[in-house]
Amino acid sequence: MFITQILFYIKPNAFLCLPKKNFLKRKQKIFFNYFIGPIAFIWLSFSIYKQIKNQPNLPEAWEAIKLSFYGASSWKLYAVFALMFVNWGLEAKKWQLLVKGVQTISFFRAYRAIFTGQAIALNTLNGVGEYVGRVVYLKDGNRLRAVALSIVGSLSQIIVTMAMGIIGLIYLRTNVLDETHHVQGLNKFWLDGLMYALSFWTIIFILIYFQLSWLTKLIEKIPFVAKYTFYIQKLEDFHWKELTRILLLSFIRYLVFVVQYLLLLELFKVDASVMQLGWMVCVLFLVLAIVPSIPIAELGLRGEASKQLFGLLSTNTLGIVFTAVIIWLINRVIPAIAGSIFIIGVRLFKK
């Protein structure tokens, strides 16, 4: 998912970045400012509702959620819900740091931008619409410039996801897979090849990440890119200390994800050691990051990948599926619902 987002590029248009000429009439601006938000809210709400309604195993998972509110282990579900706010709070802080070169925004505004990004991401291929949801909270002249900056944040997250996923694959290769435990369609030979390929690309991404300034200057020398350099110039200003800080936030956010999964796996009695489950979660995140998906099939992919991986450790298929569904509901659907509400108050243009 993150890799597709990194390759995604939004071309200049009136929605993201306007020329300085005031070519929109006042009535048109009023329409965009006061009607687009509510229209987007209705569309997003209906789309999210249809996605939830069409998901398999949802009624059973909902019953499991209701039962989980009671009992000695109910704190785990509450903790997972609380960690959702921590998770997106870390992402909001990253966004605030990333865009400060083009516009200073408050943490709360960054938080709303993240939630709105999730609302649109849930309705677009591989979540690429997330960028649009975020940049509408910036001034119209800064939106396209912020797209390049947001890619830096996605790159930091994919570096963490790939690095931890590779370690997880090594653990899977050496401690889990044997004659009776194997992943369907993936033998040790292909697994070794996958690890080498992923290691190569992780190194490439790390080099790109910490050489953004040099790389941006190099790209600016390409003739047909020269007239667009204004949109990527801010990438030159990132110091390695800032990049390290963003990478650290991505790593902490990643750990929050892992803890959420571990808590729910324990809640639903998926019996295995914490180390085994933890590294398997890392492999799962890697799969979700590199396999393209469409919104309506995202939960299906999560569920199938979870069954394949955690099925190597436990026969509790129902607990594995419940975990995948509830994580999707808490981390994806709830923020998307909040974001669809926030978008009502968005003003796309100055009056």
Model-derived features with residue positions:
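Interfacial segments of multi-pass membrane proteins
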Residues: 136-142, 303-319
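Transmembrane alpha-helix interface/packing and boundary motifs in multi-pass membrane proteins
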Residues: 120-122, 282-301
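Transmembrane-helix boundary and interhelical linker motifs in polytopic inner-membrane proteins
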Residues: 96-105, 130-144
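Membrane-interface alpha-helices at helix entry/exit sites of multi-pass transporters
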Residues: 108-109, 141-154, 316-326
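Extended non-transmembrane interhelical loops and adjacent amphipathic helices
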Residues: 111-140
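Predominantly cytoplasmic-facing regulatory/coupling regions of multi-pass membrane proteins
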Residues: 1-113, 171-291, 330-351
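Membrane-embedded alpha-helical segments of transport systems
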Residues: 120-124, 148-170, 325-337
